[in-house]
């Protein structure tokens, strides 16, 4: 029969007391939020002044999440009319961001994207207020 002299208990308590004084690994979310790396794939930001409404981001998206609406101005150049994303289908893969030739579409640090209603998941990044041409809109 084995003799129990309490060495196992003392080893366990020593480990517990050693870990007790270390910095905790977890954060008290949502009171404290961790700093995210710069290349984090969060939500999206569209710099509408840079966007040329080429539609490359729309074509690059594997789930067809992006809808780019465009109009033609007086010089017959395409201008951005609307930019919408169905976020419920987005994989956050970044192919749309990589495809943008002018870096108009970028990721931001926002990651709290949960919504209560499914209708609120649609992300409208740009909607032109006034349409100056009478030609209407076309998809890029």
UniProtKB/Swiss-Prot annotation:
Residues 42-71, 81-110 form the 4Fe-4S ferredoxin-type domain. [4Fe-4S] cluster 1 binds at residues 51, 54, 57, 100. Gene3D superfamilies: 3.30.70.3270. Binds 2 [4Fe-4S] clusters per subunit. Belongs to the complex I 23 kDa subunit family. [4Fe-4S] cluster 2 binds at residues 61, 90, 93, 96. Its cofactor is [4Fe-4S] cluster. This is NADH-quinone oxidoreductase subunit I. The keyword Metal-binding applies. Signal peptide: none annotated. Its main location: membrane. NDH-1 shuttles electrons from NADH, via FMN and iron-sulfur (Fe-S) centers, to quinones in the respiratory chain. The immediate electron acceptor for the enzyme in this species is believed to be ubiquinone. Couples the redox reaction to proton translocation (for every two electrons transferred, four hydrogen ions are translocated across the cytoplasmic membrane), and thus conserves the redox energy in a proton gradient. Keywords: 4Fe-4S, Cell membrane, Iron, Iron-sulfur, Membrane, Metal-binding, NAD, Quinone, Repeat, Translocase, Ubiquinone. It catalyses: a quinone + NADH + 5 H(+)(in) = a quinol + NAD(+) + 4 H(+)(out). GO terms for cellular component: plasma membrane. Its EC number is 7.1.1.-. One of its GO terms (molecular function) is quinone binding. It is a peripheral membrane protein. Pfam families: Fer4_7.
């Amino acid at each position: 029969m084995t003799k129990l002299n309490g060495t196992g208990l003392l080893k366990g308590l020593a480990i517990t007391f050693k870990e007790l004084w270390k910095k905790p690994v977890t954060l008290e979310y949502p009171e404290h939020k961790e700093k995210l790396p710069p290349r984090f794939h969060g939500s999206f930001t569209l710099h509408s002044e840079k966007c040329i409404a080429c539609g490359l981001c729309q074509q690059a998206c594997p789930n067809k999440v992006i809808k780019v609406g465009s109009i033609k101005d007086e010089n017959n150049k395409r201008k951005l009319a609307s930019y919408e994303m169905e976020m419920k289908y987005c994989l956050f893969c970044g192919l749309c961001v990589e495809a943008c030739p002018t870096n108009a579409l970028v990721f931001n640090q926002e990651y709290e994207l949960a919504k209560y209603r499914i209708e609120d998941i649609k992300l409208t990044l740009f909607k032109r207020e006034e349409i100056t041409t009478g030609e209407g809109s076309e998809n890029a």
